Amino acid sequence: PGTFDYTRSGNPTRRALEDCLAALEGGNRGFAFATGMAAETTALALLSSGDHLLVHDDLYGGTYRILTSVSARQGVQIEFVNMRDLEKLEQAIRPETRLIWTETPTNPMMNLLDLEAIAAIAKRAGVWTLCDNTFLSPYFQRPLDLGIDIVLHSTTKYINGHSDVVGGALIVNNPELADRLALLQNTLGTAEAPFD
């Protein structure tokens, strides 16, 4: 009754977690997923065949694997660029670029990226940005405050802290992105289970 009518679409337990995650990151809307990779899968589903995705050239191996073995096969044009060189990043943006994917510090090389500068470049080009904030957590870094559009977490790691729960998260401020992610989370079935 009321807000919740089908648990995959939403339930009070998951909503409480999503609201907490959004508050931690300073976001308007949070989404909880079964795993960090489920969160990544949902974020990548924002893209269509022919879209161009810019990714920093050092990133988590699981992300590299999904990009090269799944997204590329689905027609997403993936380009790896050293985003520590902001000029190279700006030059890599094309008319079909839809998303800039970052993590900082990176896994495994611990590269530090200037999220505020990357977000400014992306906004000038009309491109969305995503930052995997798993390593620093919202305690040390809040990418939305720096202009990033989507924050991603593997909540299995520092947010959970004990590795006894597996999960992922996406947090946004943009209502259009929130609506699209809500539809994708429900349609793809990637949501966190209510008892996790």
Cite the ranges covered by each PLM segment.
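Conserved PLP-enzyme active-site core in the AAT-like
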Residues: 29-196
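A glycine-/small-polar-enriched, mobile loop at the entrance of the PLP active site in fold-type I
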Residues: 1-23, 28
